[in-house]
Each structure stands twice: as structure tokens, then as C-alpha cells.
Amino acid sequence: MSSVSTCKAMLALLGAVMAAPVFAQDARQIMEEVQRRQRADSQHYEGTLEVIGNGNRIATKRWVYDRLGSFGASKAVLRFIAPPEVKGVGLLILNHTDKASDQWMWRPNIGREQRIAFQDRSTRFFGTDFSFEDLEERDVGQYDFQLSSDEGAAWKIDSTPRKTSQYTHSFLWVKKDTYTITRVELYTKKGLMRTIDYRDFEQLTGIWTARTTEIVDVTRNSRTILKYDKLEYNVPMKDADFTIDALRRGA
């Protein structure tokens, strides 16, 4: 090989080595900006949940969600309020910045709370198409990111969890103009497991928020559609409303 060819090869290799960390850093900066724009002291929403299974059989529930804090350092309560057979069923989630969340589920018909074991986080949440793990709120610091492709109006980002997860990695589509996530594809060792699409965005107190979320369980050919008819940010909440005692009494 000539000295010129060798020099070109070395420059090409050096360029590739230098470009790789910048590419990865760009992806992290994008996700940090996504998180920054979504941050709020608290969140409240009410809406409907439709589970559409095989044969297009539809089961509809209504629920309320409250969250105090954000992105890892947060507490949340999710509670069904209709129909009567599921009214009062609730889930308390204590999120952490450096580990998986703690979760307890309350079922009025049995009159006691159930701690959701870590090994059970991959199971479906109360007949829906998302798992208990999907309900966690994790900080971007718990993931590694790489920019997979630039698709014009959106970035496609490959996300890999640093902590134990049912998912090996996921793809996220982030709109460039609003830094909102519009689609997520979740993969396990067996392949694509779930997709999540966010639609009908509206800006509320400066935060772009999807009013419709659709989760598809690819392995079950089932989907769950969430529609939010009431959404509020930075509303007054108390730590006392995010305890097991509060979960029991329906606070």
C-alpha cells in the first residue's frame, strides 16, 4: 500500500473513531432536552382506557392518574373509577432515579394491597397491553442512547437500559420541532414486543402533551387506547396522598 493510501486509511479510521462518541453524545443531548421540556412538579389526568383484543372485543375502563415529582424522583397513583367491577382498583408507584420502582396494587374485592415483585414487572397490568414496568417513570440517566438515523422531521434513537429490564432495547422517534416522542418500539430478546404511538398533541402550560396513546402488544395481537379528557400540570399535591394507607382509603 502506498504512503498516500495508508494516510487516507488512517484518516478515515480516525474520523470514524472520533465521530462515534459525538454521535452518541448528540443522542443523549436530544433525550435530555426531551426530558427538560416535559418536566413538571406534578401531573393530573383523567381519561378512558379501551382494550381491543382478538375479534375486536372492547373492554372500556375509566381511570385517574396523579403524579408528584418527575423523572425518577416521583410518586404516582393510578386508580380505576369505572365500571363498577373495577372501581377502586389502584396502583401506587414510587419511582427512583437509580433503580427500579416500588409498586403496590390495591384490590377492594380482596381488601389488601399486593406488592408487585420485581420478577413480575413484565406481566400485563390488569388486562391491559402494557406491563407494570411500562408504568415506571425513569430518568434518562438510566439509559444509553445512540442516534440510529435522521428521518428529516424526526430523529430515530436507539435506547438501551443500564438496569435490569424485560426489554433489551427500544427505538424512539423524537420530533425535531417540539422534542416530543411520537413512537416507541420495545424489543425483548425474542424481537419486537410492543409499540406505543402518541397522537393528538396539545400544548398545556408550555408542555406538549399527547391526548391519545395507543399501545400494541405485537405478540398477542391486542391493543390498548388511552384517551385523556382532562390534563393538568403543576397542580397542588401532598406526599401523604402517595402512600399505601392513601391507596387503601382511595385518597
Region locations from a protein language model:
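Short, ordered beta-strand-loop transition motifs
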Residues: 68-74, 147-154, 204-205
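N-terminal mature ectodomain segment of secretory-pathway/periplasmic proteins
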Residues: 26-109
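A short, amphipathic edge element
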Residues: 28, 57-60, 134-147, 192-195
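Short, solvent-exposed mixed-charge patches
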Residues: 250-251
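Extended interaction-bearing regions that mediate binding to partners or small molecules
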Residues: 35-36, 82, 140, 194-197
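Bacterial N-terminal signal peptides that target proteins for export
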Residues: 1-11
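Gly/Pro-enriched, hydrophobic low-complexity segments
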Residues: 92, 102-106, 112-116, 123-125, ...
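Sec/Tat signal peptide C-region and signal peptidase I cleavage site
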Residues: 20-24
